[in-house]
Amino acid sequence: MELDINLLKNTAEAIVNKHQLPGMGIGVVSSKETLFIDGFGYSEIETKTKHTKNTIQRIGSITKTMTALAAMRLVEKGKLDMEAKVTDLVPSIKFNSNFSAIKVKHLFTHTSGIGEMPEKKDFSASDIKLWGDTGPFDIPNHYPNGIDVDFEPGTDWHYANHAWGILGEIVARVENDSWHNVIQKMIFDKLGMSNSYPGDDPVEGMSVGYHRDLGQDELDRMELIGDELIYGDPVDEVNIRGLKYDYVGTAAAGSVMATLEDMCTYSKALLNKSNGIISQDVFDSMLEVQYSPDPDLSIKMGLGFQVKSIFGHYAYGHNGGISGGWNTVMLLFPKLDFGLMIHLNLSSGLVEEITDEIVYALLGKPAIDIVKTPINDDQKNKILGVYRQRPGFVARSRPIRSLGRIQIIEKENNLYIQSRRGEWREATKIFKSDYGSNIYVVDDGKINPTLISINGDTLTVDRLASLDKDNRAKTW
């Protein structure tokens, strides 16, 4: 792929100005070399400290790919069995379940049946079950009442940081070492990532995290659970310095910090199928689709990696977000032999839009144009109605908070999607797409528009969460 450096720089500068970002780092690599690496804006606004390739970033959930590589190395060496029961490996963890046993393979794929809080009663305090004031949790003792399981393992998908905390505990026990030391030796030392840290203790050269004013969804939630509303004052027109530094309690799910330069090294290793951390065949197995609710939706789940289609191009990778101030993107396009790293010291839902703008500048015209066509009467009558999150409040707490119920309604001969919370809080027009027989495109104005699947009575958003039609529920 021929890289237009000037176009990339101009795009990055325009994005920083358009979205009033504190700072951003961009790295582009091939399997052989770093093609571009630079910082834009500030790692700290108040002191006007520049964002550079050496600025240290909290990479959040990209950590999961490192935990996955370490675990798969143990699998390859015969030290860990993907079919092993989790309770056999960590007997002190109890699962409150009437379902089959959770196996190691379920932890890799967010299909274990657990969610973003251990128990239903933790709804109002779910954050403190994930974030800590003083470093990582003692995983076996972090769940004194056990962890609720809401669906048969392997049959559904919902994001679960706690599952990755447990997988990290398993890796540590198998190696008879701490997870932090395992990642240091297996990943950082192996690849020469000398400015990377498995833990998230603040270090010199680290960017300051910023966020924006609370949106309606956050305000609604905080009022509902009785949290104190603490706004903070912008240090410029819009960016608010993080009021509190939270540690990732489930460290193996998201505690790594690294410079952009080191993450480019990591991306090059992944384009080379791990550079010897595991064999190429085992690495290929990590990219095989383990869960996909609809084959026509772009995002699917491998082992630790999300597998997706972006502008018609095959890609894999992961995003990472840290509450209070950081978003990170890692995308690898193996058929094009390039990878992209984006470091933002801003906690914001803007990250997907920013990513699409940068990828579009790199790729030019999409390989596949998504055609939008009107929805005919037969299709319309099948999809109109209200769709509810499936039973299981613990496992599905994230989509319940971010979307809630979804309705497909008709206004002035057009169909609209509307959610109780989130980006479709205001009704947004939808069209039929030629991308797949059950695929509809949301007319959200994005250069990479959102796709949804409606297959029978099941609506699936391109985040792998599925909702079922409730014929008794009323539209609003």
Model region roles, listed by residue range:
Residues 2-59, 79-81, 141-147:
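Short, conserved catalytic-motif segment at the N-terminal edge
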Residues 4, 8, 59, 63, ...:
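Hydrophobic (often cysteine-bearing) scaffold residues that line and stabilize catalytic clefts
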Residues 8-12, 26, 32, 56-83, ...:
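Active-site SXXK
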Residues 33, 44, 97-324:
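Short, surface-exposed loop or secondary-structure junction motifs
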Residues 249-255, 316-349:
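Glycine-rich phosphate/pyrophosphate-binding beta-alpha loops
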Residues 306-310, 331-335, 409-411, 453:
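Short beta-strand micro-motifs enriched in acidic
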